[in-house]
Every structure is written in C-alpha cells, then in structure tokens.
UniProtKB/Swiss-Prot annotation:
Name this polypeptide is given: Protein C10
Pfam family for this entry, one: P_C10
Role noted for this protein: In brain, may be required for corpus callosum development.
Cytoplasm recorded as keyword: yes
GO biological process: post-embryonic development
Keyword terms: Acetylation, Cytoplasm
InterPro entries: P_C10
GO cellular component: cytoplasm
Species, as recorded: Bos taurus (Bovine)
Modified residues (N-acetylalanine): A2
Compartment(s) where it occurs, according to its Swiss-Prot or TrEMBL record: Cytoplasm
Principal location: cytoplasm
Family assignment from sequence similarity: Belongs to the UPF0456 family.
Lineage: Eukaryota, Metazoa, Chordata, Craniata, Vertebrata
Length: 132
C-alpha cells in the first residue's frame, strides 16, 4: 500500500515542468543566490567539497519548492523528485532541458580532456575526415 505522500507526489509531465521551472527560479532568488555563492566559495571547485557544501544548500532550496507538491521535506523527497524528473527526460525534451539547467546550477562544469591532433583525438579524425 502506497503512502499518502507518495501518491500526492506523483506528477504528470506537465506538472513536473512547472515544478522544475519553480525550482530553477528559486535558485535565482537573492537569498538563495547568496547561499549558493557562499557554498561554491567554500568548495573551491573541489568535487568532495562541492558535495559537502554546495549539494546540501541546493537540496534545501529544492526542498522548499517541492514540499508544496507532496514531496517530503527531506533528502528522500529530493531524490524522489529527481527520479520522477529522470523518468520523464527521455520522453520530453523540455523536461530534459530544464533538468540540465537545474543540474548546471549546482554541479561544477565538467572539463573534457584535451583532444588535439597530437593526441589523435580530433573530431575530424574520429569521423574519418581528412582536413586540408
């Protein structure tokens, strides 16, 4: 038997878009922007410190929004929301885009290893194209 909170947290794809947009908007609220900036400064672009400082703040910001939609106001609620969004990403490009924007707000940019002619990793070479 499903709990009442699990039933009320079931969102349609359209509802998920609305909630995602609200969560993204919450990150731009002045007080939340300050909290995130402070957390990022404390993390110094170190992935371990990002998990320690940035992720908890990002989780709290999300919790403040999603609790109005039936998700529990704890880490489990955020995980359930994330799983729900993930389940819609493949079917709905707008949800995938919003989800990517949300992740970009609290995950550090990933740097790719260099791919130059010296490493044999150029895009043209990988496609079998010869450049003049």
């Amino acid at each position: 038997m499903a709990s009442a909170s699990a039933q009320s947290a079931a969102l349609s794809a359209e509802q998920a878009k609305v909630v995602l947009a609200e969560v993204i908007q919450a990150f731009s609220a002045p007080e939340n922007a300050v909290r995130m900036d402070e957390a990022r400064d404390n993390a110094c672009n170190d992935m371990g410190k990002m998990l320690q400082f940035v992720l908890p703040v990002a989780t709290q910001i999300q919790q403040e929004v999603i609790k109005a939609y039936g998700f529990s106001c704890d880490g489990e609620g955020v995980l359930k929301f994330a799983r729900l969004v993930k389940s819609y990403e493949a079917q709905d490009p707008e949800i995938a885009s919003l989800s990517g924007k949300l992740k970009a707000l609290f995950l550090p940019p990933m740097t790719l290893p260099p791919h130059g002619p010296a490493s044999g990793g150029s895009v043209a070479a990988s496609l079998g194209l010869a450049l003049p």
